[in-house]
């Protein structure tokens, strides 16, 4: 039970950090700027893996949809938060990151048995079949 709680909490912490960094006027004061689109891509790859641990029984399309809608919401929030701006390219990079992150989860789940057991630990699917239906 503690494992499942920690899996969910790490995702909520990630959302809180991403929301803060996405809506703060000068995030470069908190995080060094490297390549903006690469950072978006990598960040949302991590988010896709994170949501997969928090909600492993959600179908893949629901995990992807949640993160893409969240990404669009952050971009809309930036439009109203100068000097931040709305960027369609950020959304594209975020979507690509989500796709890569979910592909990595699928590959790890299918090829490394302990990963799948860890992913579904203390879920209804783990107790019944040990496999994800979505």
Spans of model-derived segments:
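Bulky hydrophobic segments
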Residues: 1-91, 95, 99-134
